[in-house]
Amino acid sequence: LCPALPYGLFDCQVSHATKEQKANGKVVFDGVIEMAKENLAQGVPVGLGTDTACPFVTQYDMWRELDFYGKYCGVSNAFALYTGTLLNATLAGVGDVTGSIEVGKCADMIVTKGNPLEDLSVLRHVEMVVKDGVIYDHPQVKKIPEVEVEMDKFNRVK
């Protein structure tokens, strides 16, 4: 959803898209939502991801994709988190080694102050990262303020 949203929903002065590109972007955005909802209704797994090569999509905003999944496809925070972790790992063929916190699996994870089951936006403020057994306390991520402002307009959580 993140890659299609800017061209489909942003003001053309922000996205620098023509009116035709915006109309096409909206068709793609609506199609992604329709396809995801139909697949969910039919029991077909839907994976999530972002595309940081696309304008307004960053390497640090997977939380937005989870939130958009809930906002536009109607899934719960719990299901969005499951999809972004264990289901994605399973679809990628690595669910036996990652994607959930279980004995024998890689224990890569993040720690936040809040509960993402209640508010996915807590994922934007990571307090700690554990990766390959190494703890990174208060990791600093260089963010793009202009992107944050524009994308925040479309998230259901602030």
Regions found by a protein language model. Name each.
Residues 17-21, 28-115:
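His/Asp/Glu-enriched, well-ordered alpha-helical/loop segment
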Residues 152-158:
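Short, solvent-exposed cationic patches
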Residues 1-29:
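Active-site gating loops and adjacent loop-to-helix segments of metal-dependent hydrolytic enzymes
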Residues 5-9, 74, 134-135:
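Short, acidic/turn-prone active-site loops that include or flank metal/cofactor-
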Residues 10-13, 56-59, 121:
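Extracytoplasmic/secreted cell-surface and envelope-processing proteins
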Residues 84-86, 106-149:
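C-terminal cap of metal-dependent C-N hydrolases
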